[in-house]
Amino acid sequence: MRMDKLAKTAKVALAAATFAIDRPYTYRVPDALAEKLVPGMRVLVPFGAGNRPSEGLVLSLADEVPEGRLKEIGTLLDPRPVLTQEGIRLALWMRERFFCTVYAAALTMLPTGLWYVLRESYAIAPGVDRETWEEKTARSPKAKQIMGLLYAAGGQADLDQIKAIPDLKDPRATLRELEKAGLITRQTQAKRKVGDKTEPIARLTMDPAEAMALLAPKQKTSPMGYRVTELLCRLGSASVKELCYFTGASRTTIKSLAKKGVLALEEKEVFRRAMPETGEITPLSTLNNQQQAAYQGLLDLMEEPAPQAALLYGVTGSGKTQVYLHLIQKALEAGRGAIVMVPEIALTPSLLQIFLAHFGRQVAILHSCLPTGERYDEWKRVRDGRAKVVVGTRSAVFAPLPDLGLIILDEEQESSYQSESMVRYHAREVAKFRCKQHKGLLLLGSATPAVESRYAAETGQYHLFTLQQRYNAHQLPKVVLADMKQELRAGNNSGLSELLRTELEENLRRGEQSILFLNRRGNSRMALCSQCGEVPTCPRCSVHLTYHSANGRLMCHYCGYSMPLPEVCPHCAGRFQFVGMGTQKLQEELQALYPDVEVMRMDADTITATRSHEVLLDRFRRKKVPILLGTQMVAKGLDFPNVTLVGVVDGDLSLYADNYRAAERTFSLLTQVVGRAGRGDKPGRAIIQTWTPDNDILNLAARQDYDTFYTGEREMRRLLRFPPFLNLFRITISGPEETQVLRACAVVRRSLDPWIKPRQHGPEGPEVLGPAPAPILKINNRYRYRVLVKCRNDKEIRAILAQILRAAQQDRANKGLSILIDVDPMDG
């Protein structure tokens, strides 16, 4: 937003500010930047008593200068705004909603390629010779060490080099003294993680006829130059790479022509593409009656002048994606953009191919596994209006579409839509805010909607649309529960029941494919000494180590610690046995049973390189690999017509977790994975192996009876006062000293009493639980305790919690502690 008058001051959100001191800081705008500076740009500014350089985001500009001395903006980092006015409003809203700083919220919206790294360096001041600095540092060994390093390094060194000086723990105080004494100067450079990609382009500088006349006499002596000129006469301009390829000329020839003035060379921005170029655009398929009814109702909402929200509840394979495609087509016809989010990166390639087939180059992809350069370029394509359909995971909700008409959350119940990084946002809440800003439609899609979403539809907060049958009248798979207790009594102690083994062999005989689901990676859950019962545990975390047969090591899945598997127990010299099966062990068992059959494994250990999930799924599809084994990556969104059997190896795994959402998560996961079978013309079967075959949740999942499950779960939540009836705020404090963490938790708990006690009566009265240890007390040498607040999520409680968080961060007794607040955490 350009001002009529030149800007004199700017309100800036700072990267260096913690939540406790986060507010807009006022800085003077230097004359050199007065015409360039725009809200949404980033700057370098001095901050604090030591005037340390900090990145900042310009929030607003003013042409008035308040009284008092102001610090001045140092460097402009961006040639154009990285956030729009909507983005700035969103960052301010996220600060209030998710207890983060404005700058952290802004950074969350940007691709990492746009992030800056500040490099601080120091140099010997001009005019300071060796004799001078040796004399002035004679009484300070630390200062003498630093000056000696700078001298040996040619007069300049960065902060990391200075910190590496032996026995010099914290050099900052000494550096400030040297700077104050005029012996050194400080410089800060801001370097971006990735730059814009360009390539040299050649264009004629004269009329084609004139160029050919100039080069004609040299056709024999300089044939390559003549060919290049001839090609440019036809094309007008071309990349240097293309000119060299089609004419056989070298870059030296092209530079020579540029020197002669025949052509000019300039750099043109090009995009690193995250996807292959598309062929012909495929027309949309015809919707069946129930899809058409849902589509028409949703289209009416999308064309409303006010923001709308809807839930599309459809059984697995009912064709929700086709409804999405038709709605996106209508949004594009209206000149508006659309965002489609999926919970797993593994789901992106298959969905992307569908969208590319229908919308071609209008599609952009945004997720964290893209190479930094590709992700940055895709973001630019969206920002510049070259792509209007964005497909991606959670972070795609921030795609800078200028006119956003539709946001779709597919599999909206998934916990991966909630961030566990520095800003603890939920993509659904951000999507609501953005749809409100753009007056667009938020569409939540699922075969097993979150209890909160289904309740919102039931109470009129969302519009509800249903798809009760599979597309093309395909039947839902037939599901059977296999009792593993009976298997054990019959002498079968393997990971596969007799029933599942029989069905697998039947599929192999028919040439049909099978998916096996086991939500535990590694070989075995733990190693156990058969004599003394010793279990190797992680020295940094309060968890046992998981055995990985691929490298023969015991590994911690929380901090990354690993150790070789001991040959014997270090306590009693007994032998280790392995308890609990993981995907590696199941793969070994399957390969022993069927040595001539390929078993493909898909988990966090096999999905390591960029796009490795795409490669695996493409091989499974094209090569017709008989068995795909994996963790929850294989449970959702995969659509392979030749998959007719799904086996759930351990249906109880998530059912008894220490989490009020355990039943919901188990039901959803089982329903989703079972739904991978029978999506083509052949009927599907599914087998759920369990130790508790009478469990209601497992039986409802086997029947895919979501409505009965929802009714019971809703009543349980009402009685226990869990979401959607009350909200949860979870305050987690972690640190290296357990007593310090407990003390901080106790202070936070007491700080809530003045607000809680007058309000705690009645069905919606607030309640505080804790302090209590987290389910895993210690992770990476940091103890974790929690305080849980049950109440309505309104401005009053958010303001009180923000005040408590500021006080806790400013309490010197809490030095070294991390204090986080999660709103309605998905992990309970």
Report the location of each language-model feature:
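Active-site phosphate-binding and catalytic loops of NTP-dependent enzymes
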Residues: F99-T108, T185-Q189, E303, I515, ...
